[in-house]
UniProtKB/Swiss-Prot annotation:
InterPro entries: GnRH, Gonadoliberin
UniProt-annotated location(s): Secreted
Name of the molecule in the record: Progonadoliberin IIB
Organism: Carassius auratus (Goldfish)
Leader peptide range in chain numbering: 1-24
PANTHER family associated with the record: GONADOLIBERIN, PROGONADOLIBERIN
GO MF, one example: gonadotropin-releasing hormone receptor binding
Function: Stimulates the secretion of gonadotropins.
Length: 86
C-alpha cells in the first residue's frame, strides 16, 4: 500500500514538473490570444496591379473556369513547367 501511495506521489510530481517545463503556445508576430490580429494601417501605394485590374472589372480569376477541373490543373502545371524552363 505504501508503494502505491509513493508511486502516485512520484507520478503526480512528474506530471506537475512536465507541465511546468513544457513549451506553451507561441503567439506569432501580430497575433494575439483569441485569434485576434493586429490591424496594420492600409498603405495605398502597396496595391498590386492585379487589384487595380480587378477594380477596373478585368479580373482574370473571376472568369468562369471550364467544367473539366483536371484539364485546368494539368494545363496550369504544364504552363508552370514551361515557364521554369525558359
Amino acid at each position: 500500500m505504501v508503494h502505491i501511495c509513493r508511486l502516485f506521489v512520484v507520478m503526480g510530481m512528474l506530471m506537475f514538473l512536465s507541465v511546468q517545463f513544457a513549451s506553451s503556445q507561441h503567439w506569432s508576430h501580430g497575433w494575439y490570444p483569441g485569434g485576434k490580429r493586429e490591424i496594420d494601417v492600409y498603405d495605398p501605394s502597396e496595391v498590386s496591379e492585379e487589384i487595380k485590374l480587378c477594380n477596373a472589372g478585368k479580373c482574370s480569376f473571376l472568369i468562369p473556369q471550364g467544367r473539366n477541373i483536371l484539364k485546368t490543373i494539368l494545363l496550369d502545371a504544364l504552363t508552370r513547367d514551361f515557364q521554369k524552363r525558359k
